[in-house]
């Protein structure tokens, strides 16, 4: 079974990683976890024109590394097979695209991200992933 965990560094995404680890520990057979973070670079494109070459990319990479650091540390302790994926662009589109190209069986993600303007009950990224995914999506 291949599992894709979409994270953004929020408390909800940390809960998603913990849930996935508990779920996979209870399963037998071949299991693999891929933890993915997507850096939404749409609002930073304008800055690329006015900043030194590579500075926006460096910022996005640092942010991605911060998002993944906790998950790496946590999953290393579990001894579960895992890898990390960093993508750039629209988060929901990249999550759906990766779920298809990676032949995943399930997506696990938090219901709300880090944005302060998220929807009341469920975040906009989670809504779009649930609406467009061809595989089961578990929201934590």
Annotate the PLM regions:
Residues 1-2, 140:
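Absolute protein N-terminus
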Residues 97-140:
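Gly/Ser-rich helix-loop-strand patches that form or flank binding pockets
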Residues 2-53:
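Small/aliphatic-rich secondary-structure junction motif
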Residues 73-107:
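Structural beta-alpha unit
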């Amino acid at each position: 079974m291949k599992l894709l965990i979409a994270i953004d560094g929020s408390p909800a995404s940390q809960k998603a990683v913990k849930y996935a680890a508990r779920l996979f520990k209870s399963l037998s057979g071949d299991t693999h976890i891929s933890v993915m973070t997507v850096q939404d670079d749409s609002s930073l494109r304008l800055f690329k024109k006015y900043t030194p070459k590579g500075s926006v990319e460096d910022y996005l990479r640092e942010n991605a590394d911060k998002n993944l650091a906790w998950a790496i540390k946590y999953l290393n302790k579990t001894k579960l097979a895992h890898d990390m994926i960093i993508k750039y662009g629209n988060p929901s589109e990249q999550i759906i695209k990766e779920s298809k190209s990676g032949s995943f069986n399930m997506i696990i993600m938090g219901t709300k991200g880090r944005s302060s303007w998220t929807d009341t009950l469920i975040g906009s990224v989670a809504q779009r992933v649930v609406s467009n995914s061809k595989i089961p999506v578990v929201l934590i």
